[in-house]
Amino acid sequence: RGLGDVYKRQPFVYFYLPDTPKKLKRLEKTDYRTFGNNGNSIITSRELRWFLRDIEDRRDAVLSLYEEEKREPLSFPIKLSAGADMEEIAAAIRNLLELTEDIQCKFRKPEVALSHCIRVLEKWDVLIFQATKIAPSEMRGLSIAYERMPIIALNRKDEPYARLFTLCHELVHIVTRTSGICNDVNENSVSQNVIGMKCNQIAGKILVPLNELSSHPTIGKIRKYGFDDSYVYQVSRDFAVILISF
């Protein structure tokens, strides 16, 4: 039992098996990335390996419950090419998330916007998990693009505004079926991963569409009186994003 606690193997009956259990093969479409969004990096954290196994097990459990209740999981409603126009992808995701300028103005806080987006996605049978024991430097978000019950995981150690951006970033991976683990979703990332950087750009367009930003009343004040932190705060509050995003 002590070894079970140390090696995170529960139940400890694993230690009485006649041989090492076979590892389940991961989906080929799942790109497990960790450091710098580098697909060649090796996952070394025990916590992250355990988390990956746990969320897959939880998905299997939910699928079993659906089967017992004779329910069919919903198919994820959007599938677009990774080469599709960024505005098209962003608009499709905003529509899926039921985001409009009026709705975003009511959020006021990123955590409220995040709860709204999670609630909408769960209606489509998207499984949302939040890691609590993994450093953001190792994983800020991950996605596994199953056609039914896709998985998105966020890092609870991140601030709500960061998790909101990560959620949108991972949604792009789901929509384009380019899932993976991301440790850096900062828009100024020097990552060479083209898809990851594109996901960052689209995530920004999901949260702050250029046409809505341009027509925001405060933008007129900035053009007339110059850039000021108070104006930036007004815009960031209305779009429920962090001030530094601007």
Can you describe what each PLM-predicted range is?
Residues R1, D5-F246:
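Short juxta-domain linker segments that transition from a proline/glycine-rich
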